[in-house]
Design a protein with these regions (language model features):
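Membrane-helix interface segments
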Residues: 50, 71-72, 152-155
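Juxtamembrane/interface alpha-helical elements of multi-pass membrane proteins
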Residues: 78-185
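Hydrophobic/aromatic residues in well-formed alpha-helices
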Residues: 75, 142, 239-240
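Transmembrane alpha-helix interface motif
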Residues: 1-68, 171-266
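Membrane-helix interfacial "entry" motifs
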Residues: 21, 25, 69-74, 103, ...
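Interfacial helix-loop-helix linkers and transmembrane-helix boundary segments
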Residues: 53, 71-79
Length: 266
């Protein structure tokens, strides 16, 4: 199995995750989208030195993965390429902010180290929450929720078509890669001299597939907007869940819960 086929399999695995049945899957897409967006906005709003406040925000995705019965390591495996890039964003902070803001015993910790860790946690937690939404909600349900929020139909259609056509593009790339390997069995990968013709052929093949797909969509009544069918019945607990989560998220932002809990047991 070449890399294009592996990517296609992983992409289709997201649809399989979204098709599972759990209390989290049965919540309405709009409520999950609302909570996820609120969680991301609140998480990134923490001060760069508020590491204890940011750390509390890990509870939402962790509880969400437990309720949805999706292992947490699945998230880290799927996002194994993106997470190191997110963590790398704050690597230079210790070199620019060298002021000591915390002492652990006799060892001083600079503000750059604190802000680096805070930024890393923000990125990881937001990715975990976003993956939780994608793993428990199909792309059709996400787009339907966006339309309920009056997001322009052009954007929702573009999002849905892009997501669906990526799988088609990967299939075409896998076919071409296999054909190239049959013609050059002893060669590892595509030689640099063939990159131009390979990409050009991939472009032509993808344009042909796109034309065929669009014509078939028009034959089925597509006129610039998708009419989303009602998915699985939503749980009655959808909006109580959303309101409860929103209240807890805002509470965690307004009050430093670790400090409050520490004061109770001091």
């Amino acid at each position: 199995m070449n890399k294009a086929q592996q990517a296609s399999v992983e992409l289709r695995a997201m649809d399989e995750l979204a098709a599972q049945d759990s209390p989290m899957h049965r919540l309405s897409p709009l409520s999950k989208l609302f909570v996820t967006v609120l969680y991301i906005v609140v998480t990134v709003s923490f001060h760069k030195y508020d590491i204890s406040g940011v750390f509390v925000m890990v509870l939402f995705p962790l509880v969400g993965y437990q309720v949805s019965m999706i292992p947490v390591h699945t998230c880290f495996h799927k996002l194994r390429v993106v997470m190191p890039l997110v963590c790398a964003v704050g690597l230079f902070n210790p070199f620019f902010d060298k002021q000591i803001v915390l002492y652990i015993g006799t060892a001083g910790v600079s503000g750059g180290v604190i802000s680096m860790l805070t930024l890393m946690m923000k990125g990881i937690f937001c990715l975990m929450a976003s993956f939780l939404l994608a793993a428990t909600t199909s792309i059709e349900d996400v787009c339907r929720a966006l339309r309920q929020l009056h997001v322009p139909k052009v954007l929702t259609s573009l999002l849905l078509l892009t997501f669906r056509y990526i799988a088609v593009l990967l299939d075409e790339a896998a076919i071409m890669t296999d054909a190239y390997r049959l013609r050059a069995p002893g060669q590892k990968g595509v030689h640099i001299s063939a990159w131009g013709s390979f990409l050009g052929q991939l472009l032509l093949r993808s344009m042909d597939r796109a034309t065929a797909l669009y014509e078939s969509m028009e034959l089925r009544g597509y006129h610039g907007e998708f009419h989303y069918a009602q998915g699985r019945p939503s749980s009655r607990a959808s909006w109580p869940f959303a309101i409860g989560c929103a209240a807890l998220i805002v509470l965690a932002r307004l009050y430093n819960l670790p400090v409050l809990l520490g004061g109770l047991f001091a």
